[in-house]
A protein has these predicted regions:
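N-terminal, positively charged nucleic-acid-binding surface of large information/translation enzymes
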Residues: 1-179
Length: 179
């Protein structure tokens, strides 16, 4: 397996001279942990499509990357610190951010290793992280444009508030209990 994983990770499927193209973006896994079976299943299907289009003569590109997962990553790092009886407030902003980036590097390395072991036909030279400068700039530009068109706005709405994190959280992050 190691031999073939190395061979495939060094190959870039490309038909640059083709007029036809196919591209897809890997739904970026969060740097909160490692890949699970669902990722493997999805990546196998996406790999099939990329290879199929390449063999059909198209310039096929499968964009690979990882997502920062903001609050979820913060929670993972805080939980790891709690095991050492340390809080983010005790660390201070700079040291805490250093811990977060350290965790990101650790988790990202595990994730990329897993994707490589799956033999996915991605172009590792074009790897992206959602907090890379280009990605971040694109998000800011999109929000500014959506705000300019009145598609998003600031207003009064009910939100799920986490009193310990002191921020709004998504419905997916809420543990509901009936009392």
């Amino acid at each position: 397996e190691e031999k073939w994983s190395k061979i495939w990770s060094e190959k870039v499927l490309s038909n640059k001279d083709s007029d036809a193209s196919f591209s897809q973006v890997i739904p970026p896994p969060n740097v909160t942990g490692t890949l699970h079976m669902g990722h493997s299943f999805q990546y196998a299907i996406m790999d099939f499509y990329t290879r199929y289009h390449h063999m059909s003569g198209k310039d096929a590109h499968w964009q690979v990357g990882a997502d920062h997962a903001g609050i979820a990553t913060q929670m993972v790092v805080e939980n790891n610190l709690a095991k050492k009886d340390v809080t983010r407030k005790e660390l201070g902003r700079e040291k805490f951010l250093k811990e977060v980036w350290s965790w990101k590097d650790y988790s990202e390395e595990k994730i990329t290793s897993q994707i490589k072991r799956l033999g996915c036909s991605v172009d590792w030279n074009k790897y992206r992280f959602t907090l890379d400068e280009g990605c971040n700039d694109a998000v800011i530009k999109a929000f500014v444009e959506l705000h300019r068109r009145n598609k998003i706005y600031r207003g009064y709405r009910l939100v799920n508030w986490d009193p310990s994190l002191k921020t709004a959280v998504s419905d997916l992050e809420v543990v509901r209990q009936e009392k």
